[in-house]
Amino acid sequence: MSTSFFSISRSFKRCVVSACLVLAGIGAASVSTPAAAEVKVGVSDWPGWVAWYVAEQKGFFKKNGADVKLVWFANYTDSIGALSSGQLDANSQTWSDTLGPLAKGLPLKAILVNDNSAGNDALMVGPKITSFAQLKGKKVALEQYSISHFVLATALAKNGMKLSDVKLVNLSAGDAAAAFISGKVDAAVLWNPWVSQIEKSGKGKPIFTSRDMPGLVPDLLVAQDKAIQTKRKELVGMIKAWFETEKFIREQPAEAAKIMSKVVSMTPEEYAVFLPGTKFFDAAANTQAFDARQALSLSSTAPIIAAFLTQYKLIEGKPDATKGIDGTLLQDALK
């Protein structure tokens, strides 16, 4: 994401991408137009998306009649540009990074929730801090305008505080972790593997994690309207394959970690740290996510996420989430 608000420095980096970069078609030149006989899907470095390679290697795509070509993006922002410019049929991206394009009227639809971050992102504090009240006036390191920024804003709001109650220190994730460990800041918003490493070292603990904000950090499969119309069979088959993938990860996590770790050049043991903090969505969880009546559905959480994006001028206009959600493919997959 070096072309976004900050540079990507490691694996598992997700950020809020501005709509203007998306509309510019960043990275478009590196991806060819999708072939008629396949569905071309962008994948970046996050467990819920790397899991697609489990589906590929275990034959779940073929089993469900889906001709899928996974396209790896080392730079997550590039994948969003490729989808927006029509060079992908679908892409792996966050709900927050989909609302910007929707506000601009791009013809995109969320068709599957792969996962929610459920502990991989955390607000880490020193051993002596036991309450949010003790954070008032303290230095908190994070990557500004990132998912980490959103996590902190949510954590403070849930505990009767505002961002102005703390002193923000804008650092890359790696630098934020180092600053926290060395005592230069009082707290830091980080993600795994730093969260688990700091806990094991005894230098800090999570006072709030993404597990405490269910539904607000969803990772999705987002498709072009045109692809939904012309390649519906493949996309429905892909959703069916996902449910087999989720079951495989749940029942055989060691084997899944072995497959996924190779994609990102890690050891299975290193990769296993990420699985507990990722809530992979099965059919039941997806059914709820696409039901607008549910409190944690995509429709219900969109205004909360959009408010954060608007406050920091990360999107222009007001996104109509109802135009960016299509649950009919999920319904077809469950028939």
Task: Give the label of every model feature segment.
Residues 2-20:
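Bacterial N-terminal signal peptides that target proteins for export
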Residues 59, 81-85, 109, 133, ...:
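Solvent-exposed, polar/charged alpha-helical surfaces in well-ordered, non-transmembrane soluble domains
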Residues 229-314:
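Secondary-structure end/capping motifs
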Residues 26-32:
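N-terminal signal peptide c-region/cleavage motif recognized by signal peptidases
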Residues 38-175, 186-192, 208, 215:
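Short, glycine-/small- and polar/acidic-enriched structural segments
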Residues 96-97, 169, 175-265:
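Pocket-lining segment of extracytoplasmic ligand-binding domains
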Residues 303-335:
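Conserved C-terminal helix/tail region of periplasmic/extracytoplasmic solute-binding proteins
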